[in-house]
Amino acid sequence: MTVRKRFGQHFLVDESAIDRIHAVLAIQPHDRVLEVGPGLGALTTGLLESADKVVAIEIDRELVGVLKDRYEALEVIEGDVLELEIDQFSGMRVVGNLPYNIISPLLTRLFAHACLIRDMNFMMQREVALRLTSDPGSKAWGRLSVTAQYHCDITYLFDVTSEAFRPQPAVQSAFVRLEPRQRTVNPVDMEGFNSVVRQAFGQRRKRVGNALKGLKVPWQKVGIDPSLRAEQIDVDGFVRIANSCVGNAATTTGEGLE
């Protein structure tokens, strides 16, 4: 099997790590599962044994052939998950050992459809997992943290060493669960919320009052000290800022997560 670096392939081979993942997933007979990047099927076998249905998305044509030959019950979609319509997977649990180079753009796409997804369970670079689960005031708290924690309750489940993969990655990994939630407070405009967060963290060393100077935020009304820096403001603080700027043209430029 040829490992293709452009796809960021690191195949999970450690049986204890595989068993631990299946234990925390606790797939039920009624579950429908979307597996992103199944590779050689390290997780696929167990998923098929437990779930009602498993759909696998694989970009590597050679691996698509391997999966189709190996698993008669598996529905395999050949393609890039970043280009597929997420709506078609409504109600499914999402599982994946993710190539590190697609984590951020994939999460961006999934967050936009979070209300349709039951949960997301991903192997990812440990550094990213720490950012996802960080707290306001820490150095790891940033744009990804705010956006992810707005959309989901996130649980850092366990670490996985580089020795669990072939070829071994240069970094450590972690397995994380993201559970979409219904918030009692929501930005009126998600594009504006994303733009506010992007602008605030785009100038981390600046006080938030200066970083968002062009938005004319009514700081006293939103209850936030403008002398704070972005990493000191929690998710609901950014929600209040975004809500106070509804209709402001400066908040209408949205981009993917960094």
Question: For the regions a protein language model found, what residue spans apply to each?
Answer:
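Hydrophobic alpha-helical segments, especially transmembrane helices
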Residues: 5, 205-206
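Catalytic cores of RNA-modifying enzymes
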Residues: 1-199, 240-244, 252-258
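Short amphipathic alpha-helical interaction segments
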Residues: 189, 193-196, 200, 204, ...
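Conserved Class I S-adenosyl-L-methionine
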Residues: 169-170, 206, 210-258
